[in-house]
Regions:
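Conserved acidic carboxylate
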Residues: 7-8
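Amphipathic alpha1 helix at the N-terminus of the CheY-like receiver
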Residues: 11-22
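Acidic, metal-coordinating helix/loop segments flanking the phosphotransfer/catalytic sites
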Residues: 17, 30-49, 56-59
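Hydrophobic/aromatic residues positioned on beta-strands within the core alpha/beta folds
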Residues: 89-90
Length: 136
């Protein structure tokens, strides 16, 4: 299985990568830190899953120029271009943005779900593994 993580926070990306590596066998994981490089890599290579942060810098060399709705734009761009599935994994407070993420899941067939990332909790780990394994 091949997975691409598009995440600008290196600690969060490593946390997600570690979680997947410990729970999924025969997995290859790549990480991109910016919207532009992530989308290009997703087009160029064949991934089973793409895990997307909602807010990403447009370019890796300018981490301050942020695209606040990166997940929606990536889903729109990849909807017809990839056979892979996408998961939104973003840090947000309970109740915040859940309607927005639900609409993305409902609106894009490649999006199988969203996960509220919180490094102090374990629930996100279980959710992301369930989504990857298809037992949500």
């Amino acid at each position: 299985m091949r997975i691409l993580i598009i995440e600008d926070n290196s600690l969060k990306a490593e946390d997600i990568k570690k979680c997947i590596s410990q729970n999924i066998v025969d997995v290859s994981i790549d990480v991109e830190q910016a919207f532009n490089t992530g989308v290009r890599r997703a087009y160029k290579e064949n991934y089973d899953f793409i895990i997307i942060d909602n807010s990403l810098p447009y370019y890796a060399n300018d981490m301050n120029d942020i695209c606040p709705d990166a997940a929606a734009i990536i889903l729109e761009n990849l909807e017809e271009e990839t056979a892979g599935k996408c998961i939104i994994c973003s840090a947000f407070e309970k109740g915040e943005k859940e309607d927005y993420f639900s609409r993305l899941v409902d609106g894009y067939s490649i999006c199988v779900g969203y996960v509220r990332y919180n490094p102090c909790e374990d629930d996100w780990r279980n959710q992301i593994i369930r989504l990857i394994k298809g037992t949500n």
